[in-house]
């Protein structure tokens, strides 16, 4: 039964902290059923709108970095927080979603069917979560209702999950594992509804509040540069994180070995003067003593000594399939595409892991990239792989080499 959302203050309580979360795990282990169960159980408390399996499973397409991904976003609240929850129908959609950062997860709910235990995609999703920087996950051990009287087997599955999490550097010993039945909760059985509420309590307490981008060091990617006669050089772009005030010192980073120091002497947005530019703003900043030739699109303006340009790094990449607009053929070790970071692309070469000869469209692989010019990147930076102006892959920097 759908519960009508009451239009009280509670629904749009801005004082609740916002967290992005998602369900991950092997195919048919119950991710979408659990997503439906969470919304349905919380709807009974007036904290969500009940969603059934079919409406979540018919996930709309969205594009991120030129890649089509089927993702279902639903929202719900607990007494403490407001959540945006992403669930993907297909395995390839999970990989694309995580690598492109279409939904940056602050934490994840790993769903494992107790009847099967961890399976190949369970491992792959845990590894991907580690690579793209998901800090913590809570485990829902599903389908417990099918294993009545088999307590020992369930205990063994739990041990296996904890060992698996620890092997990928998650805190396997302390990760909450909730035993339940998503289907039972969706059918309104009180003992299983209680388990969904227990799961959400664990998510509330174990998934840490993310450091909001406002608290991080200032960084703005340069999109455009122009000169104002008599005043100097202005760079425009979107502030990716942090904030900057008038007369603060910053560095221009990228393309050159050494950053250029300068001071911000003016900040404008929509032709209005500002004292501060902050994360999310599309702003223009006036830079003291900077010639037009000293700065270009693709560089970043950042708080001094907080980001350095690099040319070589390891990355997790997804190669688009032909049907997704990707290549029709594999690529080999001499492949030199463009790597698109923030506002610009730079040519680079690739090295495969030992034993790999090629990458076939649809593959999800780890490789090493070496760019022809240094770019401001760090662990977790997202990029697209392009050739001839079209996107053929997406990646996340997993480790800086030089």
UniProtKB/Swiss-Prot annotation:
It is found in: Cytoplasm. GO terms for cellular component: cytosol. Residues 66-70 are annotated as: G2. Residues 16-211 form the tr-type G domain. Its EC number is 3.6.5.3. It catalyses: GTP + H2O = GDP + phosphate + H(+). Keywords: Cytoplasm, Elongation factor, GTP-binding, Hydrolase, Magnesium, Metal-binding, Nucleotide-binding, Protein biosynthesis. It comes from the Bacteria. The keyword Protein transport does not apply. Coiled coil: none annotated. Residues 25-32 are annotated as: G1. Residues 181-183 are annotated as: G5. CDD domains: EF_Tu (cd01884), EFTU_II (cd03697), EFTU_III (cd03707). Residues 87-90 are annotated as: G3. GTP binds at residues 25-32, 87-91, 142-145. GO terms for molecular function: GTP binding; GTPase activity; translation elongation factor activity. Residues 142-145 are annotated as: G4. It holds the Pfam family GTP_EFTU_D3. Mg(2+) binds at residue 32. NCBIfam families: EF-Tu, PRK00049.1, PRK12735.1, PRK12736.1, small_GTP. Monomer. Belongs to the TRAFAC class translation factor GTPase superfamily. Classic translation factor GTPase family. EF-Tu/EF-1A subfamily. PANTHER family: ELONGATION FACTOR TU, MITOCHONDRIAL, ELONGATION FACTOR TU-RELATED. GTP hydrolase that promotes the GTP-dependent binding of aminoacyl-tRNA to the A-site of ribosomes during protein biosynthesis. This is Elongation factor Tu. The gene is tuf.
């Amino acid at each position: 039964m759908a519960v009508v959302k009451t239009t009280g203050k509670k629904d749009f309580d801005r004082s609740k902290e916002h967290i992005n979360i998602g369900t991950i795990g092997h195919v048919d282990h119950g991710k979408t059923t659990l997503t439906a169960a969470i919304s349905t159980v919380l709807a009974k408390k007036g904290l969500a709108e009940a969603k059934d399996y079919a409406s979540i499973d018919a996930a709309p397409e969205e594009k991120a970095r030129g890649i089509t991904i089927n993702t279902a976003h639903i929202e719900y609240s607990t007494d403490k927080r407001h959540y945006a929850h992403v669930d993907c129908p297909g395995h390839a959609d999970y990989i694309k979603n995580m690598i492109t950062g279409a939904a940056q997860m602050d934490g994840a709910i790993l769903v494992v069917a107790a009847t099967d235990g961890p399976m190949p995609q369970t491992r792959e999703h845990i590894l991907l979560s580690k690579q793209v920087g998901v800090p913590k996950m809570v485990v829902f051990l599903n389908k417990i209702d099918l294993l009545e009287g088999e307590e020992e087997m369930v205990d063994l599955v739990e041990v296996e999950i904890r060992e698996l999490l620890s092997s990928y550097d998650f805190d396997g010993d302390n990760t909450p594992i909730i035993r339940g039945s998503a289907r039972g909760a969706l059918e309104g059985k009180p003992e299983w509804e209680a388990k969904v509420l227990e799961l959400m309590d664990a998510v509330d307490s174990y998934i840490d509040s993310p450091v909001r981008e406002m608290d991080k060091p200032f960084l703005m990617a340069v999109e455009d540069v122009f000169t104002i006669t008599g005043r100097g050089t202005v760079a425009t772009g979107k502030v990716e994180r942090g904030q900057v005030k008038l007369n603060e010192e910053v560095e221009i980073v990228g393309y050159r070995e050494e950053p250029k120091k300068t001071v911000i002497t003016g900040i404008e947005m929509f032709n209005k003067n500002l004292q501060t530019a902050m994360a999310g703003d599309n702003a223009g900043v006036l830079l003291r003593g900077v010639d037009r030739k000293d700065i270009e699109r693709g560089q970043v303006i950042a708080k001094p000594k907080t980001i350095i340009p690099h040319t070589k790094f390891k990355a997790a990449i997804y190669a688009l399939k032909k049907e997704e607009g990707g290549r029709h053929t594999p690529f080999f070790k001499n492949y030199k595409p463009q790597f698109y970071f923030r506002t610009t692309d730079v040519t680079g070469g690739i090295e495969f892991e030992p034993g790999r000869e090629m990458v076939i469209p649809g593959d999800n692989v780890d490789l090493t990239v070496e760019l022809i010019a240094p770019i401001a990147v760090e662990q977790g930076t997202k990029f697209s792989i392009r050739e001839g102006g079209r996107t053929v892959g997406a990646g996340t920097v997993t480790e800086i080499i030089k």
